[in-house]
A protein has these predicted regions:
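General marker for long, soluble alpha-helical cores
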Residues: 1-222
Length: 222
């Protein structure tokens, strides 16, 4: 924002050609900032969407170091997660990077707020679904290293986490080559103390696994 325009009154500013380059909602964000005596030059940039401007303006209202997230490559939701982290005095540097989407940022921010060992899910660039499962395991003090594997989807991680919660030998099915439904059938069999070795094979379709498991369970209960 040109210093000449910065010194104009709001009434005169809205009459300038400079102000006319902005769209309606962008103009509203600039005017809101001026009314609150904020340094709108930080976000008075036509490259910002109005929603991005709004997040920067909110940060300025709270006297936050908005320079950390006042970047055009962060979308509104990413900016919000960084702003909330700054507001709570968190070390946002660990997630204030474009390589994390807003959902990943949210999970990392909440992990910092809860004093979790976020290093476990930061180093391998897990997606938000994987991070959620790792966080659930950490919260229950499980050995998450068993399933904190980038090759395992969030759904597969969930099956392994449930097995750990029920104290079964998850090593039998904690393999990337089993799909989530196969893992579920093996886990359910282990929880019922069945001999899952009969069907715990990657070439056995999950529906076949289910049929074998139910047959074994029926025989056991006779």
């Amino acid at each position: 924002m040109n210093k000449i325009y910065n010194n104009l009154s709001i009434e005169n500013l809205i009459k300038t050609d400079w102000f006319e380059q902005f769209k309606l909602y962008q103009k509203e964000e600039i005017l809101e900032g001026l009314k609150d005596n904020l340094d709108v030059s930080i976000y008075a940039n036509p490259e910002y969407k109005w929603s991005q401007m709004s997040e920067i303006r909110k940060g300025l209202q709270d006297n936050l170091n908005v320079s950390i997230y006042a970047k055009t490559y962060f979308n509104r939701a990413q900016m919000k997660e960084i702003r909330l982290g700054l507001k709570n005095n968190l070390n946002v540097s660990v997630y204030a990077t474009a390589r994390f989407n807003e959902y990943q940022m949210k999970e990392i921010r909440e992990g910092l707020e809860n004093n979790e060992n976020i290093s476990i899910y930061l180093k391998s660039r897990f997606n938000e679904y994987q991070i959620i499962e790792i966080k659930k395991g950490l919260k229950k003090k499980l050995n998450v290293s068993v399933y904190a594997n980038k090759k395992l989807s969030g759904y597969k991680m969930r099956e392994i986490r449930k097995g750990l919660e029920n104290n079964v030998d998850v090593s039998i099915y904690a393999k990337p080559y089993f799909n989530k439904k196969q893992m579920r059938e093996i886990r359910c069999g282990l929880e019922d103390n069945l001999d899952v070795s009969i069907y715990a094979k990657s070439d056995v379709y999950w529906k076949q696994m289910e049929q074998i498991r139910l047959k074994l369970l029926k025989e056991k209960n006779q």
